[in-house]
């Protein structure tokens, strides 16, 4: 399973680790992904999703159905 948020599509970022002597080495900054079982009220069922914690905060604020609709995601296919 790839490390990608199923709702937002957030993935790893390429960055640099810089030491005190300014030696730079490549580093991957992974997204904070969590496997969650979320209740979808409109579909009247549970949905398992791998989402970022940022997406979880937005789901708590807006709700799963409206948030997925704003992103153009059909939850019935998941």
Curated annotation (Swiss-Prot):
SUPFAM superfamilies: L28p-like. InterPro entries: Ribosomal_bL28 (IPR026569), Ribosomal_bL28/bL31-like_sf (IPR034704), Ribosomal_bL28_bact-type (IPR001383), Ribosomal_bL28_sf (IPR037147). It holds the Pfam family Ribosomal_L28. It comes from the Bacteria. GO terms for cellular component: ribonucleoprotein complex; ribosome. HAMAP family: Ribosomal_bL28 (MF_00373). This is Large ribosomal subunit protein bL28. Keywords: Ribonucleoprotein, Ribosomal protein. The gene is rpmB. Belongs to the bacterial ribosomal protein bL28 family. GO terms for molecular function: structural constituent of ribosome. Disulfide bonds: none annotated. The keyword Acetylation does not apply. It comes from Synechococcus sp. (strain CC9902). PANTHER family: 39S RIBOSOMAL PROTEIN L28, MITOCHONDRIAL, LARGE RIBOSOMAL SUBUNIT PROTEIN BL28M. GO terms for biological process: translation. The keyword DNA-binding does not apply.
